[in-house]
Structure formats: C-alpha cells, structure tokens
Amino acid sequence: MSVSKKDVEYVAELARLEFKEEEKDNFVNDLNKILNYMEKLDELNTDDVDIVVNPYYIENKYREDNVEKSMELKEVIDNAPESLEEYVIVPKVID
C-alpha cells in the first residue's frame, strides 16, 4: 500500500487545507516511509504472543470517603471580597 499525491490532495481538500507542490511531495514521501515501516510488523512472528487488550494491569485504589468539617457560610461570606446576602459576587467571565 502506498500514498499517492492524489491521496494527499484529496485529504487536504477534505480538511480545507492548501499546500504547495513541494509540501505535497514531502507528505507523500513521509507517509510512504511511515507505511513501509509499519509493513515491517507483518514480518514479525507473533504465534507465541498472547493477545493483550491492555498492557497495564493497574487496579483502581479506592479510599474511604471521609467527611470533614467545611467552612461555615458566615466565614465564607466574611472572607469574600464582595457578597450579597448569602452569595459571593464574582467578576463576569462569560458574555
């Protein structure tokens, strides 16, 4: 399998990208090098290799949820630069 200049132009058109002729030639060359390298994997003998879905056998380490005392509302409001009744006033970030 190889990549042609026509393939590069087609993908560029789909992505709405424009390239110079030299860049297209470079893409063709680079992509063909990558594909040739990947074809070397076909030469590997994998008969004795077990199928592995995930090479990392990591288990989640869960911890117990510990309820801790949080700040009282009055303390939060007292520490806020601006507040209105029970609400902290913050600068507008979305129009």
Swiss-Prot record:
Gene Ontology molecular function terms on file: asparaginyl-tRNA synthase (glutamine-hydrolyzing) activity; ATP binding; glutaminyl-tRNA synthase (glutamine-hydrolyzing) activity
Catalytic activity of the protein: L-glutamyl-tRNA(Gln) + L-glutamine + ATP + H2O = L-glutaminyl-tRNA(Gln) + L-glutamate + ADP + phosphate + H(+); L-aspartyl-tRNA(Asn) + L-glutamine + ATP + H2O = L-asparaginyl-tRNA(Asn) + L-glutamate + ADP + phosphate + 2 H(+)
Enzyme Commission no: 6.3.5.-
GO BP annotations listed: glutaminyl-tRNAGln biosynthesis via transamidation; regulation of translational fidelity; translation
Family, per entry: Belongs to the GatC family.
Family annotation (PANTHER family): GLUTAMYL-TRNA(GLN) AMIDOTRANSFERASE SUBUNIT C, MITOCHONDRIAL (PTHR15004:SF0)
Self-association and partners: Heterotrimer of A, B and C subunits.
Annotated protein name in UniProt: Aspartyl/glutamyl-tRNA(Asn/Gln) amidotransferase subunit C
Species for this entry: Clostridium botulinum (strain Langeland / NCTC 10281 / Type F)
